[in-house]
Swiss-Prot record:
Belongs to the TRAFAC class TrmE-Era-EngA-EngB-Septin-like GTPase superfamily. EngB GTPase family. Mg(2+) binds at S45, T67. The keyword Signal does not apply. GTP binds at residues 38-45, 65-69, 84-87, 151-154, 180-182. Transmembrane segments: none annotated. Pfam families: MMR_HSR1. One of its GO terms (biological process) is division septum assembly. Necessary for normal cell division and for the maintenance of normal septation. This is Probable GTP-binding protein EngB. It comes from Lawsonia intracellularis (strain PHE/MN1-00). GO terms for cellular component: cytosol.
Amino acid sequence: MMTQYKLQLEATNFTKQQLQQQLDILEQNNILQIALAGRSNVGKSSLINALAGRKQLAKTSGTPGKTRSINFYAVYPNTFMLVDLPGYGYAQCSKIERQHWAMLIEYYLKNCSKLKAFVLLIDCRIPPQKLDYELAEFATSYCIPLIPVLTKIDKCKLVEQNKRQKEWRALLNNTQPLLVSSKNMKGVQQLWERIQYTIDSY
C-alpha cells in the first residue's frame, strides 16, 4: 500500500530576486528541500501529480517547456519541499529564455543550503544525452546527492529499460536509476521511499 503524502503549491519564482527571498524564508525555518529536474517533455509535471495522487496539481501539457518557473511544493505530514525546476533543452523557445531558465537552475543549486537531493528525470526511450549528463555532473560537483529516475517506462520494453539502466549506471559511478511510470504508477512508491530516506538522514 502506498504511503499517503499531501502536496501543496507554496510558491512560484520567476526571477532570481524572488528565488533568493524564498530560499531565505526556507533557510530561516530550516525547511529541507528535494529538487526535481529534467529535459522538457520528460514527464516531470505528470510525475509530481503521481507523487501527489492528484491529476492537476502540476499543470501538464503536450507542448514541451510548460514549467517556466521554480515551483515549491510543501510535502505533508513530513514538512519538506519538493522543488520543481524548469525543463531544459527545449529548442523552440528563444535563446534568451533558455539562458534565463539555466540561470535560475544554476542559481538555485549554488545557493540552496537546504537542498538534500537532486532527482534527475531521464526519458527511458532515448539514449543518454549530453545535457542530462552535464546537469548530473554539475549537481555532484556541489556534493548534492543524485537520484536518477528513468521516466515513461510504460512506453519501453523491459530489454530497453535494462539497457538504459546499464548505460546510466556506467555514467553515474554505478548509481542505479529508478524505473518509474506516472501512467501505471510503477516505481512511484520506491521514489517516495528514496526521498523519505534522504530526508530522514538529516
